């Protein structure tokens, strides 16, 4: 039992246990719920990785009848805007643009030439670059239009995009004034611009804790660019390799997610 002054401040009275004695004595009220502030989560920034498609000696790439395989997801580890800074990246968009023209060795031939490109996803890179023969079934080696992913490896390789670039040789080199009068009726298109922009790729790559961005750094999920030209099939062109020089520049738009 406790004692307290009454409301008039005269004397003291007895109070029972549990009885309140404040301003809100006898009032029934509800406890106010605490309001939580919603803090928006900032999504990871979109990184842009740009590079020129060149050989190790800084010369332009020459694509022939023998298909070549190049790694697109080659993001080095670092803190810059074009680096990966986590153990996982998602490639959303890919841009390739530049100019294609006939090589000097193939320019003397007359006829159409087609250049093929594929974007191929590899779910299990095995820390080594595959050959085109490991990916495609090739009924005709010189005709890329007949190539399809091998049935035994369909769970590993997926063709994300495929496109072609068309050229026409008129018997003379690019920029040459010399004309073969036998074929002066041929409308040449031996140099063309090639631009492609792909969205919605969503290629997820898991990385090891190494920094150079090569195929050996990838645990899962790599993206390749495979290129080849269509070869000759009859006559003098049956054993001819049509070579196309590609002066390309690439841009990869990706996000770095996951843990550091």
From Swiss-Prot:
Residues 1-23 are annotated as: Disordered. It is found in: Virion; Host nucleus. Keywords: Capsid protein, DNA-binding, Host nucleus, T=1 icosahedral capsid protein, Viral penetration into host nucleus, Virion, Virus entry into host cell. A motif (Bipartite nuclear localization signal) lies at residues 10-36. Transmembrane segments: none annotated. Encapsidates the viral genome into characteristic twinned ('geminate') particles. Binds the genomic viral ssDNA and shuttles it into and out of the cell nucleus. Plays a role in protection of the genome from degradation, virus acquisition and transmission by insect vectors, infectivity, and systemic movement. The CP of monopartite geminiviruses is absolutely essential for virus movement. Homomultimer. Interacts with the movement protein. Binds to single-stranded and double-stranded viral DNA. This is Capsid protein. The lineage of its organism: Viruses, Monodnaviria, Shotokuvirae, Cressdnaviricota, Repensiviricetes.
């Amino acid at each position: 039992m406790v004692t307290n002054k009454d409301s008039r401040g005269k004397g003291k009275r007895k109070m029972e246990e549990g009885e309140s004695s404040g301003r809100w004595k006898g009032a029934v009220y509800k406890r106010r719920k605490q309001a939580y502030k919603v803090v928006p989560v900032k999504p990871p920034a979109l990184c842009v990785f740009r590079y020129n498609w060149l050989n190790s000696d800084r010369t332009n790439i020459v694509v022939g009848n023998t298909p070549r395989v190049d790694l697109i997801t080659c993001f080095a580890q670092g803190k810059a805007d074009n680096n990966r800074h986590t153990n996982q990246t998602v490639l959303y968009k890919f841009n390739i643009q530049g100019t294609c023209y006939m090589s000097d060795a193939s320019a003397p031939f007359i006829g159409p030439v087609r250049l093929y490109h594929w974007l191929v996803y590899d779910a299990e890179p095995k820390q080594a670059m595959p050959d085109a023969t490991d990916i495609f079934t090739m009924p005709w080696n010189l005709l890329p239009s007949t190539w399809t992913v091998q049935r035994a490896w369909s769970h590993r390789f997926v063709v994300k995009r495929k496109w072609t670039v068309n050229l026409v040789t008129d018997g003379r080199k690019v920029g040459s004034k010399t004309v073969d009068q036998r074929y002066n009726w041929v409308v040449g298109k031996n140099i063309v611009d090639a631009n492609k922009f792909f969205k919605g790729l969503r290629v997820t790559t898991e990385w090891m804790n190494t920094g150079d961005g090569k195929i050996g750094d990838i645990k899962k999920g790599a993206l390749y660019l495979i290129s080849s030209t269509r070869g000759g099939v009859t006559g003098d062109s049956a054993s001819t390799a049509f070579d196309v020089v590609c002066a390309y520049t690439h841009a990869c738009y990706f996000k770095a997610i996951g843990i550091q």
